[in-house]
C-alpha cells in the first residue's frame, strides 16, 4: 500500500454552534453558500449527487446546483443518464457540498422528483447555445467509439436547429426535497462541529406555514 497518511491539516478557521446557527436548515445553507460565493471558492455551486441502483450499488457524480427554495434543491441533467435511470427506480438521493477553503461540508438527503416541463423549458432556453446543442449531441452515460461522435453530433444538431434548439424530451430538471440536513465545520484536534436537522413535520397547505425541524449535535 502506498501511504499518504502524512497529508493532514488542522482545521481552525471557524466554529458552528447552536446559538449561531439558524433553526431553519435552508437558511443555514443559504448563509454558508453565500459565504462560499463571497470567498470566491471555485464553483461553490458544485455538489456531489449520490444515487443507488436496483442492485443496491451506489454511484456518485458532481453536478451544479441551479436553484433552491423551500421546495428543495434543483439541478438539470439528462434523464437517460445513469443517475436518471437510478432515480427512476429509487427516488431517494443524497447531496454533498464540500467547501474546502472554508473547511465546511453540507450533506442533504431526501426524495427526488422531476420539476415541471415549464421549469425545465425556462432553464433550458436560458443556457448558452452550445450547451443547448450539447444536450442533443451527448447520449450521456452510453458507450461511444470516440470523441468524434460528439463532434459529429454537435455539428448535425447545430445545422438542424440553427439558433433555436428545443429542449430534448430526455433532458430536464430534478428537485430533491430535503428531510435531512447535516452541517459540518472542521475544528482543531478533529473535534469537529456537526449539526443535524431532521424533518419531523412537513409544511402544511396553510398560508405561510413552515416545516418543523429538530436540530441535534452529533459527535464528529
Curated annotation (Swiss-Prot):
The keyword Oxidoreductase applies. It catalyses: pyridoxamine 5'-phosphate + O2 + H2O = pyridoxal 5'-phosphate + H2O2 + NH4(+); pyridoxine 5'-phosphate + O2 = pyridoxal 5'-phosphate + H2O2. Pathway: Cofactor metabolism; pyridoxal 5'-phosphate salvage; pyridoxal 5'-phosphate from pyridoxamine 5'-phosphate: step 1/1; Cofactor metabolism; pyridoxal 5'-phosphate salvage; pyridoxal 5'-phosphate from pyridoxine 5'-phosphate: step 1/1. Substrate binds at residues 8-11, 66, 123, 127, 131, 190-192. FMN binds at residues 61-66, 76-77, 82-83, 140-141, 184, 194. The keyword Flavoprotein applies. Binds 1 FMN per subunit. GO terms for molecular function: FMN binding; pyridoxamine phosphate oxidase activity. It comes from the Bacteria. Its cofactor is FMN. Keywords: Flavoprotein, FMN, Oxidoreductase, Pyridoxine biosynthesis. It holds the Pfam family PNP_phzG_C. It is an enzyme of class 1 (oxidoreductase). Its EC number is 1.4.3.5. Homodimer. Catalyzes the oxidation of either pyridoxine 5'-phosphate (PNP) or pyridoxamine 5'-phosphate (PMP) into pyridoxal 5'-phosphate (PLP). This is Pyridoxine/pyridoxamine 5'-phosphate oxidase. The gene is pdxH.
Amino acid at each position: 500500500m502506498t501511504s499518504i497518511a502524512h497529508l493532514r491539516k488542522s482545521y481552525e478557521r471557524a466554529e458552528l454552534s447552536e446559538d449561531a446557527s439558524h433553526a431553519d436548515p435552508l437558511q443555514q445553507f443559504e448563509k454558508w453558500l453565500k459565504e462560499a460565493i463571497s470567498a470566491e471558492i471555485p464553483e461553490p455551486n458544485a455538489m456531489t449527487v449520490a444515487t443507488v441502483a436496483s442492485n443496491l450499488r451506489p454511484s456518485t457524480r458532481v453536478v451544479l446546483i441551479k436553484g433552491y427554495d423551500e421546495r428543495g434543491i434543483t439541478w438539470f441533467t439528462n434523464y437517460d443518464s445513469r443517475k436518471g435511470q437510478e432515480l427512476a427506480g429509487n427516488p431517494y438521493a443524497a447531496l454533498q457540498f464540500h467547501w474546502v477553503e472554508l473547511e465546511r461540508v453540507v450533506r442533504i438527503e431526501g426524495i427526488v422528483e422531476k420539476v415541471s416541463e415549464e421549469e425545465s423549458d425556462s432553464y433550458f432556453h436560458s443556457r448558452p447555445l452550445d450547451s443547448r446543442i450539447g444536450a442533443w449531441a451527448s447520449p450521456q452515460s452510453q458507450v461511444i467509439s470516440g470523441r468524434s461522435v460528439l463532434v459529429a453530433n454537435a455539428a448535425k444538431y447545430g445545422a438542424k436547429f440553427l439558433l433555436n434548439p428545443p429542449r430534448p424530451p430526455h433532458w430536464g430538471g430534478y428537485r430533491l426535497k430535503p428531510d435531512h440536513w447535516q452541517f459540518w465545520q472542521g475544528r482543531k484536534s478533529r473535534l469537529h462541529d456537526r449539526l443535524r436537522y431532521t424533518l419531523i413535520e412537513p409544511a402544511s397547505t396553510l398560508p405561510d406555514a413552515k416545516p418543523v425541524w429538530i436540530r441535534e449535535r452529533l459527535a464528529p
